[in-house]
């Protein structure tokens, strides 16, 4: 791991936090089909390139019965499962993603969605919603898919960081949907209308507030991924903010 392994985790984490917060602050905000943001340059460029060369190979668990999705948890003691020579950098990534600074940046940028969520959850305001970050590295292989879904109510904010080496996997991003009459023509997407696919570009990502029917019938956070075709893993980091520390993956 060379330079990264020799640098103190806390120093790396501070640099990562500063970059991540700046990225989120500069993110594009969209309210259609539901409140979400798209951000670029989430990691410092040199760190990102080094990180890609040092994706962990140990500590993953299968998520799908087909084995097309493998997951490596990056929170709590799970970081200790990562190879020792890679651990300091990934511990810094974990510290950044679970930091109060990143949480605050997300709260500010997605305040409109959090206000909708708060009303549906019957809490006084968005500030009363608890956000507990639990990041996970995902490695998806050829054939992986997940049908459109709004996410479980245990999740308050879903945030995904794309980690490809180049733009050749750009078609493999997450698709956002909405319920509409046009959706009846899209049997493959369970009669939901695809609105857009967020390109799977290097060092970019998105985040949205999880909204169910009781939060808003017109702003439900429908998203999914049609079957991917790829000759190499699709690597991403899902940083999910849960409603409390007792739930999550």
Model-derived segments and spans:
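Catalytic core of Fe(II)/2-oxoglutarate
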Residues: 2, 143, 150-155, 172-249
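Short loop segments at secondary-structure junctions
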Residues: 41-43, 163-167, 211-213, 242
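Phosphate/oxyanion-binding loops and surfaces in catalytic or ligand/nucleic-acid-binding neighborhoods
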Residues: 54, 58, 166, 244
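Non-heme Fe(II) oxygenase catalytic core, chiefly the N-lobe of the double-stranded beta-helix
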Residues: 97-157, 164-177
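Non-heme Fe(II)/2-oxoglutarate
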Residues: 26-113
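Fe(II)/2-oxoglutarate
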Residues: 1-32, 184
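Active-site rim elements
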Residues: 37, 83, 87-97, 101, ...
């Amino acid at each position: 791991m060379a330079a990264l392994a020799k640098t103190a985790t806390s120093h790396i984490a501070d640099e990562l936090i500063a970059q991540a917060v700046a990225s989120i602050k500069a993110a594009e905000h969209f309210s259609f089909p539901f409140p979400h943001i798209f951000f670029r340059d989430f990691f410092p460029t040199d760190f990102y390139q080094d990180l890609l060369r040092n994706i962990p190979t140990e500590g993953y668990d299968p998520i799908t019965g087909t084995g097309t999705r493998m997951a490596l948890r990056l929170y709590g003691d799970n970081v200790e499962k990562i190879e020792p020579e890679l651990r300091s950098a990934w511990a810094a990534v974990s510290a950044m993603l679970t930091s109060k600074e990143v949480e605050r940046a997300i709260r500010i940028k997605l305040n409109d969605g959090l206000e909708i969520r708060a009303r549906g959850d019957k809490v006084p305001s968005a500030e009363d919603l608890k956000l507990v970050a639990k990041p996970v590295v995902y490695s998806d292989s050829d054939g992986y898919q997940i049908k459109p879904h709004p996410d479980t109510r245990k999740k308050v904010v879903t945030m995904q960081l794309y980690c490809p080496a180049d733009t050749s996997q750009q078609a493999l991003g997450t698709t956002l949907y909405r319920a509409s009459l046009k959706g009846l023509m899209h049997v493959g997407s369970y009669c939901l209308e695809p609105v857009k696919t967020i390109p799977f570009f290097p060092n970019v990502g998105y985040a949205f507030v999880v909204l169910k029917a009781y939060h808003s019938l017109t702003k439900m956070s429908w998203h999914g991924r049609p079957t991917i075709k790829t000759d190499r893993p699709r690597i991403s980091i899902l940083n999910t903010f849960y409603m409390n520390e007792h739930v999550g993956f």
